[in-house]
Swiss-Prot record:
GO terms for biological process: poly(A)+ mRNA export from nucleus. LRR repeats lie at residues 245-270, 271-294. Residues 100-179 form the RRM domain. This is Nuclear RNA export factor 1.
Length: 628
């Protein structure tokens, strides 16, 4: 009984103590009480409020701790000091994007980072590494966001060779949670609006100085400092989408200490010639190296602690030139640049053209074919009229294949019609995913004119927006002509509100009699057109309309010899006429047929011009060219 009474008293004292703690009488305050007290004093004296400068820390990757049973205590218990499922769920990892961590093992000891980035840029289109660093083991580490880039890096394992040292770079990738947290959609939209209003389109200038003090942030009581990795990445993503052609950028007065996240500017804003990093908190010399590669000519860096470490101006200028060798104005004072090269006027960018044609005659031929082809292909009765397209294909040697895939940036977009998507996916011939149809590969492509016509008639009805067509001729020879048609189209129920998709169709055709051609190869690619992609396509298309289609300049002799009626794509006449011309050239020159044919071909099958050229170079023609 005494034992029970003692137990009861002890239990009562513990209950009273815990109850006092909950009520605040036990001398212990919980986190909510501390937060309320801190905020109350902050309202009385704003200087006591945190500036959140502790957010500006170097990026630390999220590490997954895998603890074996033997390290969890006696008996292999999964409890003890281990984290429960509930505690892991509250760590914030679920609020992070899944990215790909890439590692070049031992490369930091053998090759330069700039060299390796250059090699990867040549292999991977639009390569944008994040948080590039080298660890204590001598490895280069960085992150990429999309799986395609990670797969390409992994596929080039030991294929990148440093010729001077003979080093073959080994690449490894792994899927990990991103070391930055995701922002809410509302926060991202506000950041985009703030960036938009700070952009000067006329001068191509983006002013992000005092970014966190923008009135729109203050009105919503938001702390959107550029010292936070997720905020900086959101800003950089928006720059990449809309303002990649800026020539001047200001990041002054943002309390920036580290440039790990901002270093992505090197692959995003490649034309920045004026950069303002003044009045930040950069204190180490190595930070500025992360911006090396930008063609900066005017640089502002005053007001950073690292500047005070230089006692001589020459040393300060030399330090800046290590990252920006073209810098000719530093902190408003002219300096002698380390590298002087030809001035490239980035305003004279290569114009986006509305396609390419080798000559006007080929343009007429291609446009007539495209118009006639889609007259049969489109319309509410397209599944019936497409059967007539068997006349457009070679009877036996023609092939047709279709691929539907999401392009980068629209991976989460969905086709507007599930039934149409299922029809496309059922015959999709994506060679990157051929393991899915390796056993029945023959069913994914059609061969022969009749089989192709049947395959086309089974596809959903469509209506192509012909005013969006862009045509590029990529191959021209005497026997083959290759061209690509790309643009927008609608499919499915054409009576509903149009929801356009993007297509690219590559034709390979050969000449036939009576001014006609026959399709040898037809490859159709379809993808969902997201709103962002539609906006970009419209901008490019408007620019192409202003610039017009590119047509190669040819001489009057070539134009006179190039035609469609009975001639090949390179201007050669039909075979009977060609044989007669070769025979006449043999009689005129005394050369054997192969050399006579070459002489005529070099002169665009202009007989008079070929005879004139032969008389000019007769003395230099080799003896074996003449009949004995």
């Amino acid at each position: 009984m005494e034992r029970d009474g003692c137990f009861g008293n002890c239990w009562l004292r513990r209950w009273e103590k815990s109850d006092m703690n909950r009520k605040g009488f036990g001398g212990h305050r919980d986190a909510k009480q501390l937060s309320r007290t801190k905020n109350r004093f902050a309202r009385l004296d704003p200087d006591t409020q945190s500036r959140y400068e502790d957010d500006d820390e170097p990026a630390v990757p999220v590490r997954a701790s895998l603890t074996s049973a033997s390290s969890r205590g006696r008996g292999g218990s999964s409890r003890g000091f281990g984290q429960s499922a509930a505690s892991i769920a509250n760590t914030g990892v679920r609020n992070a994007d899944i990215v790909y961590k890439c590692r070049a093992t031992g490369a930091a000891k053998k090759v330069d980072a700039k060299w390796l980035i250059k090699q990867l840029n040549q292999i991977i289109e639009n390569f944008k590494p994040l948080l590039w660093t080298d660890n204590a083991r001598g490895d280069f580490e960085w992150y990429v966001r999309d799986e395609d880039t990670a797969s390409t890096i992994r596929a080039n394992n030991r294929r990148v060779v440093h010729k001077e040292s003979g080093t073959r770079v080994e690449f490894y990738t792994s899927k990990v949670p991103a070391p930055w947290m995701k922002l809410k959609r509302e926060e991202i939209e506000i950041i985009h609006r703030v960036v938009d209003k700070r952009h000067n389109a006329e001068n191509r200038v983006l002013d992000l100085s005092n970014f966190h003090e923008d009135e729109e942030f203050k009105a919503k009581d938001m702390m959107m400092n550029l010292t936070k990795g997720n905020v900086m990445l959101t800003v950089l993503d928006h720059i990449d989408d809309k303002y990649g052609n800026i020539v001047a950028l200001s990041l002054s007065n943002n309390r920036i200490r580290h440039l790990d996240y901002a270093s992505a500017l090197v692959s995003i804003a490649k034309f920045v010639m004026e950069l303002d990093l003044s009045h930040n908190h950069i204190s180490t010399e190595k930070e500025l190296e992360k911006f090396a590669g930008l063609p900066v000519e005017r640089f502002f860096f005053e007001g950073n602690p690292v500047v005070e470490s230089f006692t001589q101006r020459a040393a300060y200028i030399s330090y800046i030139h290590q990252s920006f060798p073209r810098c000719n104005m530093l902190d408003g004072v002219e300096v002698q640049p380390l590298v002087v090269g030809p001035d490239l006027d980035i305003h004279d960018a290569m114009p986006f053209r509305a396609g390419y044609y080798p000559n006007p005659q080929i343009r007429v031929l291609v446009e007539q074919f495209v118009t006639s082809y889609f007259d049969f292909y489109d319309g509410p009765d397209g599944q019936r009229t497409r059967r007539n397209l068997h006349n457009a294909y070679d009877a036996d040697a023609s092939t047709f294949s279709l691929t539907i895939e999401h392009l980068r940036g629209s991976s989460h977009a969905r086709h507007h019609n599930d039934e149409c998507f299922a029809q496309y996916a059922g015959v999709s011939h994506n060679v990157l995913k051929q393991e899915r149809f390796a056993r029945h590969r023959a069913s994914r492509s059609a061969r022969g004119a009749m089989d192709i016509a049947v395959a086309l008639s089974k596809l959903p009805t469509s209506s192509h927006m012909r005013d969006t067509f862009i045509v590029d001729v990529f191959l021209q020879s005497n026997d083959l002509l290759g061209f690509t048609v790309q643009g927008l189209f609608c499919d499915g129920d054409l009576t509903q509100t149009p929801s356009p998709s993007f297509f690219s169709r590559s034709f390979l055709v050969s000449p036939r009699e009576n001014d006609s051609v026959a399709v040898i190869s037809d490859q159709l690619f379809i993808t969902v057109a997201s709103l962002d992609r539609l906006e970009k396509f419209k901008k490019l298309y408007d620019q192409s309309i202003a610039n017009g289609a590119a047509v190669e300049q040819v001489s009057a002799v070539q134009i006179a010899q190039i035609g469609v009626n009975g001639m090949g794509f390179d201007g050669a006449p039909a075979l009977p006429i060609r044989e007669e011309m070769i025979k006449a050239m043999c009689q005129f020159s005394g050369m054997i047929p192969p050399f006579s044919e070459k002489c005529l071909a070099d002169c665009a099958w202009n007989f008079d011009f070929a005879c004139q050229k032969f008389n000019e170079i007769k003395s230099s023609v080799p003896a074996e060219a003449f009949a004995h």
